[in-house]
A protein has these predicted regions:
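Polar, enzyme-active/binding microenvironments
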Residues: 1-175
Length: 175
């Protein structure tokens, strides 16, 4: 079944996703137009209960690539990324209301290519690549309070990049 299309067919490379029970959010990182790729700051959304094309939501505070997202019931969060250097930035949107992303705080390190997940109250970013090397470190934010992330622990195994994460109310998994 065809759900719909993104607003620009060339968007989609490196998108991270989040949302709520009613909206799906796409935070894009690259526009792939032959022969070049451009880093972008585009946010789009779909209404999950109905088919149709994605609509413009707003923009990230800065264009970046290889960032990751997690969501609470009311907000979607973007962590890190590159453009061209690594970022410590955490941004958020209020999922139910269109508009531009806002600054939330910073990760403890500049990083990209990791994975994020969360539950209703907490988001966790782990893995990826920081300035030194691949990392297995995890850090957390409390969704309700603007501020910086704090160290949370490590994911099992040596550092990895281009990984995925999924979670429910009590556990997060990285692979």
């Amino acid at each position: 079944i065809d759900f719909g299309n993104l607003t620009a067919q060339s968007l989609g490379f490196g998108a991270s996703t989040g949302g709520s029970e009613t909206r799906g959010i796409f935070m894009f990182s690259m526009q792939s137009s032959s022969p070049t790729r451009t880093v972008v700051d585009v946010i789009e959304f779909v209404t999950i209960s109905q088919t149709g094309n994605a609509l413009d939501f707003g923009n990230l505070t800065a264009a970046s690539q290889t960032h990751q997202c997690s969501s609470s019931p009311t907000r979607t969060f973007k962590y890190g990324g590159f453009n061209p250097s690594r970022s410590k930035g955490i941004e958020f949107i209020t999922t139910a209301t269109t508009g531009n992303a806002q600054d939330f705080g910073d990760l403890t390190r500049a990083v990209g290519r990791g994975a994020a997940c969360g539950n209703a109250t907490r988001g966790i970013y782990a893995g990826g690549e920081d300035d030194a090397a691949l990392t297995d470190e995890a850090e957390k934010i409390e969704y309700a309070t603007l501020g910086n992330a704090v160290e949370f622990g490590d994911v099992v195994g040596s550092g990895r990049e281009y990984i995925s994460a999924v979670s429910n109310r009590v556990r997060g998994l990285w692979s």
